């Protein structure tokens, strides 16, 4: 259905997954790609989105753009997480339908599954019991997105596919201490602690000039920097992380998520996502992950080893852990012809090397 000349709009092409999907498509010879930054196109604005689709008339759409963040952000900004994500999805999926887009790929999240879902989580676990409280608004928005895709397909015969990635990490990740996900946040915290531990103030100032922390940048005094970093559990002697470190998590390298996404975009149709002859068609989304898990503590220790931080690792058990276990069942993805290759140790090494290059992306809406 799609060929190398097809116009493909990647919504969120500067973000963690979007940038990787863009690069993957380019490497496969798809050069008629369209992307807009948040400044160029506000996906919360229905008029702007409609005008964009009127002008560009894409053949396919990859919707990676979302309002995202870690536990702290999800707890504090609950209205933002449900409202903004619903609005983005409503605008992009709605205009894709109005403009006859041939294929749409929607990226969700495994937080759609119940807090007490049986492990590993199959697609059929969706809506079987209550969600994790901390990110419930975000999860409900993502469930609405996948149900929009499913419902348009059933009512109008469209070809919209929803994929649910596990925890992702990789180039162009968000390392801001206030609102990033767990693995990049740990890399930055442990990196800064090592710099403080080795008295490498040049590296500390370079880091916080690139990504200021609550208004504190490299022009501030040593004490101001120390005080602010201590608020986030970063000291020369130790790094303090949220929770107990006991929750088990699965991590997928973002460039592999991109490869899986493009594989689905090019090779999987809606009819391939459910059993033929089913009386009730539901749970047509596809989990994307490794099917392997390890504890947050183990991840932190691997990062400590990679960065060579000689200080201590401490845990603040007064802070929430989130769901204790989240492992995807990826048998559906495997049956559709895709398997992961990059393991966690290699991924951490690659990501820290990328981080040291000093690249910073604006993650306001990616």
Put a short name on every predicted segment.
Residues 82, 86, 134-146, 176-184, ...:
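Short-chain dehydrogenase/reductase
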Residues 68-69, 110-118, 166-169:
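Active-site segment of SDR-like NAD(P)-dependent oxidoreductases
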Residues 12-16, 20-28, 192-366:
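C-terminal substrate-binding subdomain of Rossmann-fold SDR/epimerase-dehydratase oxidoreductases
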Residues 4, 90-135, 161, 174:
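Conserved Rossmann-fold NAD(P)-dependent oxidoreductase catalytic core, especially the SDR/UDP-sugar
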């Amino acid at each position: 259905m799609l060929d190398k000349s097809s116009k493909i709009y990647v919504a969120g092409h500067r973000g963690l997954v979007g940038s990787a999907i863009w690069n993957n498509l380019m490497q496969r010879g798809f050069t008629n790609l369209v992307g807009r930054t948040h400044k160029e196109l506000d996906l919360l604005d229905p008029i702007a989105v409609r005008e964009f689709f009127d002008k560009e008339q894409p053949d396919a759409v990859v919707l990676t753009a979302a309002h995202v963040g870690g536990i702290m952000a999800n707890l504090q900004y609950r209205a933002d997480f449900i409202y903004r994500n619903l609005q983005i999805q409503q605008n992009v999926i709605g205009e894709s339908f109005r403009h006859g887009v041939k294929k749409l790929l929607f990226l969700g999240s495994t937080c759609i599954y119940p807090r007490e879902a049986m492990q590993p989580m199959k697609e059929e676990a969706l809506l079987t019991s209550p969600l994790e409280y901390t990110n419930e608004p975000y999860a409900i928005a993502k469930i609405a997105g996948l149900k929009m895709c499913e419902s348009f397909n059933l009512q109008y015969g469209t070809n919209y596919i929803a994929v649910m990635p596990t925890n992702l990490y990789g180039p162009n990740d968000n390392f801001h201490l206030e609102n990033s996900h767990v693995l990049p946040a740990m890399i930055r915290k442990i990196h800064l602690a090592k710099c403080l531990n080795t008295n490498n103030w040049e590296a500390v100032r370079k880091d916080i000039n690139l990504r200021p922390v609550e208004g504190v940048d490299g022009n501030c005094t040593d004490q101001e920097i120390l005080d602010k970093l201590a608020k986030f559990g970063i000291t020369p002697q130790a790094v303090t992380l949220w929770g107990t470190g006991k929750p088990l998590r699965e991590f997928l390298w973002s460039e592999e998520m991109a490869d899986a996404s493009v594989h689905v975009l090019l090779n999987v149709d809606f009819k391939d996502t459910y059993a033929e002859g089913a009386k009730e068609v539901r749970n047509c989304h596809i989990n994307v992950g490794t099917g392997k898990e390890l504890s947050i503590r183990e991840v932190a220790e691997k990062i400590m080893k990679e960065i060579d931080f000689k200080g201590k690792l401490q845990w603040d058990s007064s802070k929430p852990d989130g769901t204790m276990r989240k492992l995807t069942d990826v048998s559906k993805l495997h049956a559709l012809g895709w398997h992961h290759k990059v393991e966690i140790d290699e991924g951490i090494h690659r990501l820290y090397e990328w981080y040291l290059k000093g690249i910073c992306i604006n993650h306001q809406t990616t």
